[in-house]
Amino acid sequence: MSSGKIVQVIGAVVDVAFNQDVVPTVYHALEVHIDSFNKKLILEVAQQLGGGIVRCIAMGNTDGLRRGLVVINLKHSIEVPVGKETLGRVMNVLGEPIDMKGPIKEKEKWSIHRSAPLYSELSTDQDLLVTGIKVIDLMCPFSKGGKIGLFGGAGVGKTVNMMELIRNIAVEHSGYSVFVGVGERTREGNDFYNEMINSDVINKVALVYGQMNEPPGNRLRVALTGLTMAEKFRDEGHDVLLFIDNIYRYTLAGTEVSALLGRIPSAVGYQSTLSEEMGILQERITSTSLGSITSVQAVYVPADDLTDPSPATTFSHLDATIVLSRQIAALGIYPSVDPLDSNSQQLNPLIVGQEHYNVARDVKSILQRYQELKDIIAILGMDELSEEDKLIVLRSRKIQRFLSQPFFVAEVFTGFSGVYVSLRDTIQGFKEIIEGKYDHIPEQAFYMVGTIEEVIKKNKTL
């Protein structure tokens, strides 16, 4: 094995000198043993500086590193465990278990740096993935193998929506999921793990964490670690869900690494390679003739500004965008999805069918009209509206409340038992509200229920 020596350490960036004839290539993994801490640290080559010196990014804490330490070239990129042995386990960026449950005992390891599938291998199927969440299935349906973005500021419910989706896919569809925590809070990661155990779906999920306190190299590469595990499940013929929370932190880690490597930043301080880095990740998240990877990516929107370069770059890769609104959350309506801002390429009569398309379009137009009437109501009151507009306001308020739904993973917060609603029941319920079948039922009956039958039952108790 070829070895070199550390010549410079600046935070998470380490320069290593090798002989000219054995210089490692970019993305090669290097290993260094830190005697004072009795631990091994993995470095990833980011640049060749010339003269046999390579600049590396540390995949862990650099405490104890010093000049002169021997570094071994592993002659391959970072490799992580793949396969069913990873299910139910919590791992770090290197695929090492961090859940105190012993070694993973994997049969195979894959490199985290892989090429996207060839164009000829891609699947063109347009199958819908029913989530059991009314507002998503009706207004912005998911496709198998699609990329979905959950956009929202801090505290509007991105992680809770993800937890519910994992629970529904595991329980109702018996599917595998890979959850990647990129730069999120350790507390959230712990809560998420415990929720998966409580929902009895832990054995269908592989969890990969690179938390906020980790060095930027970890946070930049952890998404690729999770994606590699998902690719293995896909290639075995499974329809797998890949959850990334949060794609914004992935961009941020790239910004930090870029600055550490001395690259010139672009707009708002982001790295000049933002589009390329995002493209490398997103192009690998795709479906082939063997199986599908459907990805749900939480996207933190800085200061609720959707034009920020990070969310704006993510937008271009997505098939569906779900915008979580602070105004809707303030009304106590959860999930706080904004049906007017959210959209999906799948909402097409040729894919979802004419009835579904018509109901979704009617719901949107009623809610849009209510939005326009709000100013008039605020100034002049309801009495000044025409009879037709009064009816629209009445129905839109019922629709708005019927879009709320009790989640299984949020039972402890809401006090309501979670419900999974079939697509047929969702379409039927909204269709009947639009037709005026329930104009006599007060709007309170539509809040936090599943199907329209539950509305009728709740109305009897009011």
Swiss-Prot record:
The keyword Transport applies. GO terms for cellular component: plasma membrane; proton-transporting ATP synthase complex. It holds the Pfam family ATP-synt_ab_N. Keywords: ATP synthesis, ATP-binding, Cell inner membrane, Cell membrane, CF(1), Hydrogen ion transport, Ion transport, Membrane, Nucleotide-binding, Translocase, Transport. It is a peripheral membrane protein. Its EC number is 7.1.2.2. Its main location: membrane. It catalyses: ATP + H2O + 4 H(+)(in) = ADP + phosphate + 5 H(+)(out). This is ATP synthase subunit beta.
